[in-house]
Amino acid sequence: MKAMLLHKFGEPLRLEDMDVPKVGVGQVLVKVDYAGVCHTDLSVRSGAIFNRISSSKPTLPLVIGHEIAGEVVELGGNVEGFKKSDKVLIDPWIGDGSCHYCKIGEDQYCDNPKWLGINVNGGYGEYVLVPDYRYMFKLRNLSTSTASPLACSGVTAYRALRLANLDPSKSVMIIGAGGGLGSIAVQIAKAIHGSFIIGVDVSEEGLKLATNLGADYVTSKVDEEEVRKITTGRGVDAIIDFVGSEFTTSNYYTLLAKLGRYVKVGTYGGGLPHDAGLRLHSMGWQFIGTLTGNRKDFLEVLELAENGKIKPMITKVLSLEEANDALDNLEKGKVSGRQVLKVT
């Protein structure tokens, strides 16, 4: 099989031939149709992600890519509910089933995870071995191209908005509203929560996309006075930060209303400012970090997409061989919505 392999952190992926994985008990071999291109893939390529999760550092070479949809081609023993030719979306956040977090249904925080494309081989190759069939979900109405970004951008945005505790009476600011996660978040915030949405993005293309998806107000330069004006003087009830830079975490928390929630998803180096900590009590603020969603979140966001309530905004389709180009586009800020690789 052909795959894009990471041999050394910080270097481009290499297109190579490798053996098709062998299938064991409870495992499934999937032919990859499409793989989404995520900022996490960039972080894996550079190795930066393992500064935060050093216990999950992989042995190289590694096939990266964790937003994976494709077709079942081989099933191991004791696999139930699937057959060859089923079209599936794979939940890449695979737990060992035995740690505390798996037992409470938060497998994505497993102490000994098998994260596809992060510490075990993922979707930038013609075939991927799913270590546990329970982390696969059949597709009914969705194409594999449309479905693939749901595995990370969809479920992560869904979880962040759930943690924000939104309803139609509340407002939410989405930072990075034109990106892969932000564009899904705008749709969820509007369709499911009915909230007033302020979309923030640095690109005009991203702002146009957020507007088309239902954002009520968009801007590339946040003005505190204007934000308070459009939120009846209170400020925003929630901020979903898909960037998480020093600039966003330092400058936007002051826009929170009393009892507001700041949900940090992005990992671009920003931390909680000292002043924010001092004001937690008087304002009743909550600062929440989230990695991604659990299997319940995964099922719910997939159902939303199957029913046409949300749709990943795929703005560019590239070949497997163009994986480095796709990652470079993302790194240079040239992408709104989501890029996907057509693998087979």
UniProtKB/Swiss-Prot annotation:
<dbReference type="InterPro" id="IPR036291">
    <property type="entry name" value="NAD(P)-bd_dom_sf"/>
</dbReference>
<feature type="binding site">
    <location>
        <position position="102"/>
    </location>
    <ligand>
        <name>Zn(2+) 2</name>
    </ligand>
</feature>
<dbReference type="InterPro" id="IPR020843">
    <property type="entry name" value="PKS_ER"/>
</dbReference>
<keyword id="KW-0560">Oxidoreductase</keyword>
<keyword id="KW-0862">Zinc</keyword>
<dbReference type="InterPro" id="IPR002328">
    <property type="entry name" value="ADH_Zn_CS"/>
</dbReference>
<dbReference type="Pfam" id="PF08240">
    <property type="entry name" value="ADH_N"/>
</dbReference>
<dbReference type="Pfam" id="PF00107">
    <property type="entry name" value="ADH_zinc_N"/>
</dbReference>
<comment type="subunit">
    <text>Homodimer and homotetramer.</text>
</comment>
<feature type="binding site">
    <location>
        <position position="96"/>
    </location>
    <ligand>
        <name>Zn(2+) 2</name>
    </ligand>
</feature>
<dbReference type="InterPro" id="IPR013149">
    <property type="entry name" value="ADH-like_C"/>
</dbReference>
<protein>
    <recommendedName>
        <fullName>NAD-dependent alcohol dehydrogenase</fullName>
        <ecNumber>1.1.1.1</ecNumber>
    </recommendedName>
</protein>
<feature type="binding site">
    <location>
        <position position="99"/>
    </location>
    <ligand>
        <name>Zn(2+) 2</name>
    </ligand>
</feature>
<comment type="similarity">
    <text>Belongs to the zinc-containing alcohol dehydrogenase family.</text>
</comment>
<feature type="binding site">
    <location>
        <position position="110"/>
    </location>
    <ligand>
        <name>Zn(2+) 2</name>
    </ligand>
</feature>
<keyword id="KW-0479">Metal-binding</keyword>
<dbReference type="GO" id="GO:0008270">
    <property type="term" value="F:zinc ion binding"/>
</dbReference>
<feature type="binding site">
    <location>
        <position position="152"/>
    </location>
    <ligand>
        <name>Zn(2+) 1</name>
    </ligand>
</feature>
<dbReference type="GO" id="GO:0004022">
    <property type="term" value="F:alcohol dehydrogenase (NAD+) activity"/>
</dbReference>
<dbReference type="InterPro" id="IPR011032">
    <property type="entry name" value="GroES-like_sf"/>
</dbReference>
<feature type="binding site">
    <location>
        <position position="66"/>
    </location>
    <ligand>
        <name>Zn(2+) 1</name>
    </ligand>
</feature>
<dbReference type="InterPro" id="IPR013154">
    <property type="entry name" value="ADH-like_N"/>
</dbReference>
<feature type="binding site">
    <location>
        <position position="38"/>
    </location>
    <ligand>
        <name>Zn(2+) 1</name>
    </ligand>
</feature>
<keyword id="KW-0520">NAD</keyword>
